[in-house]
Amino acid sequence: MKRRGWLCALVALCPLSCEHLGPRTIVADRVAYDDAVATSWKEQALLNIVKLRYFDTPFFVDVAQIVSGYTLGEQVTPALGFNQAFFPGATFGQRLVGNLALQETYLDRPTVSYAPQTRPDFIRNLAIPLPPSAVLYMMQAGYPVDVVFDLTLDAINGVQGRSVSGAEVRPASAEYRRVVEILRKAQLSGSVGMRIEVGKDKKESLVMFFREPDIDPELAAELVEARNLLHIDPARREFKVVFGAARGSGEEVTMATRSLFRVLTLLATSVQVPDDHLAEGRAPPLGGDPGTDRPRFTVFSGCQKPKDCFTATCYRGRWFWVDDRDAESKRTMAFLMVLLALADTGTKEPVPFLTIQTN
């Protein structure tokens, strides 16, 4: 009976050593790392927005590589002893006692490598204006035209939008707000679109067009109003789109786009700086007249980290956050993440070689 008990215990341990650990970790780990990287990405973007409000230098660090390794170890220690304090007349075998100790070890050893975003192409993409094609691609992809234009355009065909220079804010003109309002209606109805045309010289040109047949007569009249406000031919339905700050011809639309750095600077004006920081001169007060522009992005500040926040970061001893109930700010933040991803293009710097222990 003793021998049978020992054999049963050893057989019971065998499945532990044969069980596959790796496949069961993929789902849990992938989701966990995805959430962690996305959370840190948002916090980094918010931190750089807050830094710009304080005239500090933004900086980006990329998660270059994640390698996760697991080690499962088992150790079985048998012990045999002789118990003298036993009932009188016990045989030698009855006085023998034994035990079996099982020790399992589970080690998770993730290796994360980081890379500062100092590549020339990344810095250049932050500094140069976005191409008009990127703006219209975002609109074509379904991003609201009012969000896209308000964040990425200084002017459209000479009609001035909201602009920021340092801490001075210039509101968008009434004509600009009306044009964006009409284009948003056209976007929702599917009456506006864009395409790429290739000319005889093999050069590509960007064309924005309006689908006016069979649309609501009221919307058709508003689209004519928008073309008049933009000083383009109201009878035309297709227009070439080019980069420029000045008004183009009646057959083309110019777009004065912003760089990603200016997009971040614009969002920085929505940071609520603590009063004592303003009084101490740590951040400048906003100048100019914001007009009637409703902010699409709001960053709150306080001494304690809130429990219900979309993303938060700590800077200079204060917490700054985007409220999780502020859908407009969350949508703006999500669009900013796409713009930052567009800037992170080009040749990647080689990641470091990692030596991974396999036993």
Where does each model-flagged region fall?
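N-terminal export leaders
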Residues: 3-7
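Hydrophobic helical h-region of N-terminal Sec-dependent signal peptides
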Residues: 9-12
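N-terminal amphipathic/basic membrane-interacting segments and domains
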Residues: 19-359
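C-terminal motif of bacterial Sec signal peptides marking the signal peptidase cleavage site
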Residues: 14-17
